[in-house]
């Protein structure tokens, strides 16, 4: 089976067009983009199109759309990641679905490939989900 996956909820407002063409999506959950309204819209569309729903956390950096490496303490990054994912998960559960996967965004995703400590912070932060969903990694 082929899984066509797409990042959504990032402010382009094209989810209605893209959702029927994909199998799964990564929904921005407040770090680089996304808010309650956009997350809710994306989750509703995902459910209506039977798409797998993923969280798309990032460095907390809306100014640079999560595209730049952010120097942030381990504790602050961990708190941000947990808040981002749990915010989306609450919406998913309220709408009767479940979190299928987690895929980091932008600089966080790319930096983890080269930075073991950052990777460990990320994995520790999302460890609560290890038996519940898939992890899309670099």
What are the language-model segments listed below?
Residues 27-32, 111-112, 130-138:
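Catalytic beta/alpha-barrel core
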Residues 12-39:
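A short alpha/beta connector and helix-capping loop motif
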Residues 8-10, 31, 59-61, 103-108:
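Active-site-proximal loop/turn and secondary-structure-junction residues that shape catalytic pockets
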